[in-house]
């Protein structure tokens, strides 16, 4: 959700 988090968490 947060954009500051690394893309790996989005996966």
Curated annotation (Swiss-Prot):
Main location: secreted
Record localization: Secreted
Keyword annotations from UniProtKB, A to Z: Antimicrobial, Secreted
Tissue expression remark: Expressed by the venom gland.
One GO cellular component term noted in the UniProt record for this chain: extracellular region
Name the UniProt record assigns to this protein: U1-poneritoxin-Dq2c
């Amino acid at each position: 959700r947060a954009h500051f988090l690394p893309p790996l968490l989005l996966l």
